[in-house]
Curated annotation (Swiss-Prot):
Principal EC category: lyase
Oligomeric form and interacting partners: Homohexamer; trimer of dimers.
UniProt lineage: Bacteria, Pseudomonadati, Pseudomonadota, Gammaproteobacteria, Lysobacterales
Name this polypeptide is given: Cyclic pyranopterin monophosphate synthase
Coiled-coil stretches: none
Top-rank taxon, per record: Bacteria
Amino acid sequence: MPAKTTSARLTHLDDAGLPTMVDVSDKQVTARSATAESRVHFPAAVAAQLRANGLRSAKGGIVETAVIAGTMAVKRTHELIPFCHPLPIDGCRFEIDWAGAQVLQIVCTVRCVHRTGVEMEALTGASVAALTVYDMCKALSHTMRIGPTKLLSKRGGKRDIGAAR
């Protein structure tokens, strides 16, 4: 029988079906981590141009700017996603590199010691970094595509998901 990976209940709805923030005050404080990925797909000519320019655009260093924007997004996730708790982020790391001739892979890993996980922070960081890459390159093409964006792993809560990074 496969491992259970979902809950039968939506945690952000109360008994009356109204939206609510989950009360984590009784949860155990543990080391938490999550890793998420997003990808940016480029037309062949744009990918070739970016490779030739060392991932620099007219706006500056693409990777450097994406890391800064993604990090800022991680720290502000609770301001963007209504029921995310503000968390003391202990670490945020990005790996950005080519994953094929035309695909830039963005991996964001977030760590904290708290009562709730950092999945949304990792997903937000990877997403905003991908959006920043798009913004940095849109002068070259508007046919770039972002996705998929997905959670690769999480550690430290009720259940671990995916391979640790």
